[in-house]
Swiss-Prot record:
EC code: 2.4.2.43
Pathway(s): Lipopolysaccharide metabolism; 4-amino-4-deoxy-beta-L-arabinose-lipid A biosynthesis
Transmembrane segments: 8-28, 81-101, 111-131, 132-152, 176-196, 207-227, 255-275, 291-311, 313-333, 349-369, 380-400, 408-428
Keyword check for Glycosyltransferase: yes
Any one GO CC term of the record: plasma membrane
Gene Ontology annotations of biological process type: lipid A biosynthetic process; lipopolysaccharide biosynthetic process; protein O-linked glycosylation; response to iron(III) ion
Source lineage: Bacteria, Pseudomonadati, Pseudomonadota, Gammaproteobacteria, Enterobacterales
Keywords recorded for this protein, A-Z: Cell inner membrane, Cell membrane, Glycosyltransferase, Lipid A biosynthesis, Lipid biosynthesis, Lipid metabolism, Lipopolysaccharide biosynthesis, Membrane, Transferase, Transmembrane, Transmembrane helix
Reactions mediated catalytically: 4-amino-4-deoxy-alpha-L-arabinopyranosyl di-trans,octa-cis-undecaprenyl phosphate + lipid IVA = lipid IIA + di-trans,octa-cis-undecaprenyl phosphate
Recorded family membership: Belongs to the glycosyltransferase 83 family.
Name this polypeptide is given: Undecaprenyl phosphate-alpha-4-amino-4-deoxy-L-arabinose arabinosyl transferase
HAMAP family (alphabetical): ArnT_transfer
Keyword check for Nuclease: no
Name of the gene encoding the protein in the UniProt record: arnT
Cell compartment(s), UniProt: Cell inner membrane
Length: 551
């Protein structure tokens, strides 16, 4: 009965964190609106080979992540839950792999149960795992690679090793088809310390070719299909999205070497106090037969790899949290047995985080010291919801701190208030510029019959296209990440410059209403826009809706 009760509690906790909130949070631009629309177009056109965004060639990523996202919308429909389901599915499968690996490494049921709990409630994992991006998918394939290599290394039979390396090839192949060739580099650097320390080179060289062959066979059908349909894909994807993005001096998202350290620290909440001890114990046990060194290698080596790369984003280190959660779970259970101070300190940290959050809410509220508060006076209920969310965090931290021997696991409940309430507490000023669904809903009666819809922001373009279920959104003045697709001869009608807008409008408005949804710069007003006078206008924060009717 006790195990059944625990099982039901874990399922309920998962539903509260990962299922219930999904449909109640508006989609964020640019990421969620982009991936929502790419998958919608894939379903609408039936083209499962070439990724398109707003009807344009979009070669930022390969195809497999879009497949998973499309299946989510196909199963659950045209809603926010369907858009985000692919990420939740991938991160859930990763958690199950974490549980499997924890059991195979330590043969401890408690470690196997606690590891996915820590993984799913870690802030970085939760934030990305409920957000419609491709990083949860690549994390799934890298976790599968981590598990399959360990399974192959521990197999006692030739058939077991063949199966493990074949599965490794599948994982790497799907990783390549999700995010590119980094899916090959990360497993190599991840296993390197363990292979060197255990002197397993001969086995790797003997069976590694099988993984390479299987990986190639997985990628080959789609790789040849897209090369035939779009011969420029592989050139653009390799040189622009890999070399320029990660290695060159002008790399995209350039950041210093230490960039990921704050994200590792904040991302480990609400289990932060376990981080130093888990890493230290993993290092001290590196010479033991069990897999502490293997797990530590999968944490440290990818972390260093991405730190060395010039282009950086917080989501890149998500795969590090799979092995890290196993090390943290084992350390937490040992600390509970020995009465180590780390569990009390963890409660204190969570209490402090909750209290700091409450103070921050007060500071940025209409009654705070900020000249321009985050929330306005009519958003009192949002301040209250944010305060409740942080109060829950502080309460769970306080309970764990008072009795760390029995209540330390309450840390898993610390982010629950945020998970359930954050979607309702987003300030209006943020919604206006970052969540275009809100504006589209307000002006939908005018937008729906529009013959032409233009916008100067790619993220808003994705939101408009997804909400209106039309891919013919025209970019106005700015091309952004769509420059490559817009440069093709068959895409010339998808962009209108600001200088040529007046002439374009005179030619096209007779065909039907022309609508513009523009994101203005900070401090800019609608009257500052150098545009012809519209027939209808609506301003919402930094976003303005303009409409020109036929004359």
């Amino acid at each position: 009965m006790k195990s059944i009760r625990y099982g039901v509690s874990l399922i309920a906790l998962f539903a509260l964190y990962y299922l219930l909130p999904l449909n109640f949070r508006l989609l964020w631009q640019p990421d969620e609106t982009r991936y929502a629309e790419i998958s919608r177009e894939m379903l609408a056109t039936g083209d499962w080979v070439v990724p398109h965004f707003l009807g344009l060639r979009y070669f930022e990523k390969p195809i497999a992540g879009y497949w998973i996202n499309s299946i989510g919308q196909w199963l659950f429909g045209h809603n926010n839950f369907g858009v985000r389901f692919g990420s939740v599915f991938a991160i859930t499968m990763t958690a199950l792999l974490v549980a499997w690996l924890a059991w195979r490494v330590f043969r401890d049921k408690k470690v196997a149960v606690l590891s996915p709990v820590i993984f799913l409630t870690a802030m970085l994992v939760y934030a990305i795992g409920t957000y419609a991006v491709l990083d949860p998918m690549i994390t799934l394939w890298l976790a599968l690679a981590m598990c399959s290599f360990w399974g192959a290394a521990q197999a006692q039979s030739r058939s077991g090793k063949i199966l493990g390396y074949a599965l490794l090839g599948v994982a790497c192949g799907m990783g390549v088809m999700t995010k590119g060739f980094l899916a090959l580099a990360v497993p190599v650097v991840g296993v390197l310390p363990w292979v060197i320390a255990r002197k397993r080179w001969r086995e790797v060289l003997t069976y590694g070719w099988l993984a390479v062959i299987v990986c190639t066979l997985v990628v080959l059908p789609w790789g040849l299909a897209i090369a035939q349909r779009e011969p420029d894909f592989w050139r653009y994807f390799f040189w622009v999205e890999h070399i320029q993005r990660f290695a060159e001096k002008d790399a995209q998202h350039k950041a210093p070497f230490w960039y990921y350290i704050p994200f590792l620290i904040a991302g480990s909440l609400p289990w932060l106090a376990l981080l130093p001890g888990a890493l230290k114990r993993g290092w001290l046990e590196r010479d033991e037969a069990r897999g502490a060194l293997y797990l530590l290698g999968w944490v440290a080596m990818p972390f260093l790899f991405f730190s060395i790369a010039k282009g950086k984003l917080p989501t890149y280190i998500l795969p590090c949290f799979a092995p890290l959660s196993i090390l943290m779970a084992r350390y937490a259970l040992e600390a509970a047995k020995t009465g180590a101070k780390a569990l009390r300190i963890n409660g204190m940290i969570n209490l402090g985080v909750g209290l700091l959050g409450l103070i921050a809410v007060l500071v940025v509220s209409p009654w705070g010291v900020m000249h321009k508060p985050v929330w306005t006076k009519i958003e009192l209920y949002k301040c209250l919801l944010a305060a409740i969310a942080f109060a829950v965090w502080a309460l769970m931290g306080w309970l764990a701190m008072k009795n760390p021997g029995r209540r330390w696991s309450l840390a898993a409940l610390c982010p629950l208030g945020l998970a359930l309430l954050v979607g309702f507490a987003i300030p209006d000023r943020v919604i206006d510029s970052k969540q275009p669904q809100f504006l589209v809903d307000i002006v939908s009666e005018s937008l729906q019959p529009s013959r032409y819809v233009l916008t100067n922001n790619v993220g808003i373009a994705g939101g408009l296209a997804w909400e209106l279920k039309r891919s013919d959104i025209i970019m106005f003045d700015k091309q952004g990440e769509l420059k490559y697709g817009l440069d093709w001869p068959d895409a010339q009608g998808s962009f209108v410059s600001q200088a040529g807008f007046a002439d374009w409008l005179a030619t096209h408005r007779q065909q039907g209403p022309v609508s513009l949804v523009l994101l203005m710069d900070k401090g800019e007003s609608m009257v500052d826009l150098p545009l012809p006078k519209p027939d209808n206008a609506y301003e919402l924060g930094r976003v303005v809706f303009l409409q020109y009717l036929p004359q």
